[in-house]
Amino acid sequence: MTNRKVVVTGLGVVSSCGIGTESFWEGLCASPSAGDRRVENFDPTIYFENAKEARRSDRCTQFAIAAAHMAMEQTGELAAETDRSGVFIGTGIGGIETLEEQINILLEKGSRRVSPFLVPMMMPNAATAAVSMKYGFQGPAENTCTACAAGTHAIINASRLITSD
């Protein structure tokens, strides 16, 4: 263990409380609205190279790409080499929306209509892989899938790796 400090240099948030750090904070401080709490008015295409790439990503991955984009904008230019830069993401379940959609397609239209992208879209580690590839990071790419504690676990695991080097 070294005395190396871990610092957070950028944040990105896509949440039912708000998209972006300022909107998120305002949403946390405000009284919750009645009814469903969902992410609305979210256009994933602005965070992807093209609309097709966005469509071939589950909403979980779309949120991760958007949050990473926001965090990278705040961070600015990275000083670390890409082979030492990694991605640690925590998710409660990953691409469940894609799985649900494709089960409905299977039941209504048959197996030939199920998307060939089902498995790569629904994997919990799809978000981590997408962020790593988007930014060319070649270091560790770890996904933690531990329900509500996943984000905290991802931060702890990344912090441990940084301080162990």
Which residue ranges define each predicted feature?
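Conserved "HGTGT" condensation-loop signature of ketosynthase/thiolase-family condensing enzymes
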Residues: 1-140, 160-163
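Short loop-beta-helix segment that forms the pyridoxal 5′-phosphate
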Residues: 140-146
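Short conserved active-site loop signatures built around small residues
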Residues: 151
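Short, conserved alpha-helix that lines the donor NDP-sugar binding/gating region
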Residues: 155, 159
